């Protein structure tokens, strides 16, 4: 993998926050198809906070869970204005106070925008970490803890993106591409099975 960075398109911390929230249970490719119109209509939290549910819904209706995401986007924008002066906060704990923002989203924003030494664990990071042997954790929190302990602070952001991309394109959920994986010699699952899962 040449570049370990987000595949989501964005031009500001606020727009990355929108994109990451929309990406839950949806592909980055689909989110990127819709974000140009969303970003043009909502350049800042003010415009989004003032928008109607129907207006937001129409822009995101082909993204998974549009009802919840539309409500959360409007609430999130309002809280950014009321609690954070319209700025996206840098601390994960503050980010998690925003509607629709959980630990994974908070860690993505803190890492990508503010270079905080945190690792966001999504389905790809969880799967790859357990398969290759970086963690034996049975839940997201345990895997995050293991990865945080296992990677130096300055590499955690890159590790997060590398694990995501490796999970999307090589160590896929179904039919992983073990034969073309550069980690065969290091991979616990490959060593145990000596074949694809």
Question: Could you describe each region identified by the protein language model?
Answer:
Residues 1-197:
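Catalytic cores of DNA base-excision repair glycosylases
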């Amino acid at each position: 993998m040449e570049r370990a960075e987000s595949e989501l398109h964005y031009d500001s911390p606020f727009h990355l926050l929108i994109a990451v929230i929309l990406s839950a249970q949806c592909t980055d490719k689909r989110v990127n198809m819709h974000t140009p119109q969303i970003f043009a209509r909502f350049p800042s939290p003010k415009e989004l906070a003032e928008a109607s549910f129907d207006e937001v819904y129409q822009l995101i209706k082909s993204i998974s869970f549009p009802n919840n995401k539309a409500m959360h986007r409007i609430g999130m924008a309002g809280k950014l204005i009321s609690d954070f002066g319209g700025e996206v906060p840098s601390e994960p704990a503050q980010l998690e106070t925003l509607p629709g923002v959980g630990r994974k989203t908070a860690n993505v924003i803190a890492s990508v925008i503010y270079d905080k030494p945190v690792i966001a664990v999504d389905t790809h990071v969880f799967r790859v970490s357990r398969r290759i042997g970086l963690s034996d954790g049975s839940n997201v929190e345990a895997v995050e803890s293991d990865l945080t302990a296992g990677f130096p602070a300055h590499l955690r952001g890159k590790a997060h993106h590398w694990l995501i991309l490796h999970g999307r394109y090589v160590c896929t959920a179904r039919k992983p591409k073990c034969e073309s994986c550069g980690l065969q010699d290091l991979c616990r699952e490959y060593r145990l099975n000596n074949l694809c899962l």
